[in-house]
């Protein structure tokens, strides 16, 4: 059986942590930031976990992660 391929877009967006949770970055932080308040931009900093109902589909896109 051939090797399974990793979806490269998912590999760029997600990181699998040691406990099995998946880390992702926040959206709405790339451009058009002048109309967004300082508070909203500050709250979009950092990373968050992918919701547990979506973890299985993300892990399926990255079989070797």
From Swiss-Prot:
GO terms for cellular component: cytosolic large ribosomal subunit. Residues 1-21 are annotated as: Disordered. It comes from the Bacteria. Coiled coil: none annotated. The keyword Ribonucleoprotein applies. One of its GO terms (biological process) is translation. Keywords: Ribonucleoprotein, Ribosomal protein. Signal peptide: none annotated. GO terms for molecular function: structural constituent of ribosome. HAMAP family: Ribosomal_bL35. Belongs to the bacterial ribosomal protein bL35 family. This is Large ribosomal subunit protein bL35. It comes from Nitrosospira multiformis (strain ATCC 25196 / NCIMB 11849 / C 71).
């Amino acid at each position: 059986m051939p090797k399974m391929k990793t979806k490269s877009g998912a590999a760029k967006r997600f990181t699998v942590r040691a406990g099995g949770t998946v880390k992702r970055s926040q959206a709405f932080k790339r451009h058009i930031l002048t109309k967004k308040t300082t508070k909203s931009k500050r709250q979009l900093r950092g990373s968050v976990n992918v919701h547990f109902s979506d973890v299985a589909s993300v892990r399926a896109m990255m079989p070797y992660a």
